[in-house]
Amino acid sequence: MSLNQDQVFQYEREGYVFPIDVLTPAEVATCRESLEAAEMESGGKLPPAYRAKSHLLFKWLDDVIRDRRVLDPIEQLIGPNILCWNTIFWIKDASSESFVSWHQDNTYWGLSSDKVVTAWLALSPAQTENGCMRVMPG
């Protein structure tokens, strides 16, 4: 999987590019099932301690972050030698009042490099009703 020139230009101009379909619907469903199984093992909700750096806890997620279909587009944007600094589960049900205020990931995280990419993988439909992600160009 690679980005076309229009997608690369959009990223350079706007700071984001989406959607990039990297996993099949069946693979996404398997990821969701794995997450839901982990939630059930934890009593119905994934504990906060399991929601960050989750690729260190769940082999299936570690496999996703190492998948060439995920890494190749990122490499096109920031170059090789990619480090996955964090993975986060932001689990938000429809009509939930939880939110994340506007922010810039690179500034928010306090990392020293400007070669930072957020690769967001939706495991459920992203709709207005459940507070889908919004991006601001630039």
Regions found by a protein language model. Give the residues of each.
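Non-heme Fe(II)-dependent double-stranded beta-helix
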Residues: 1-111
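Catalytic core of non-heme Fe(II) oxygenases with the double-stranded beta-helix
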Residues: 98-138
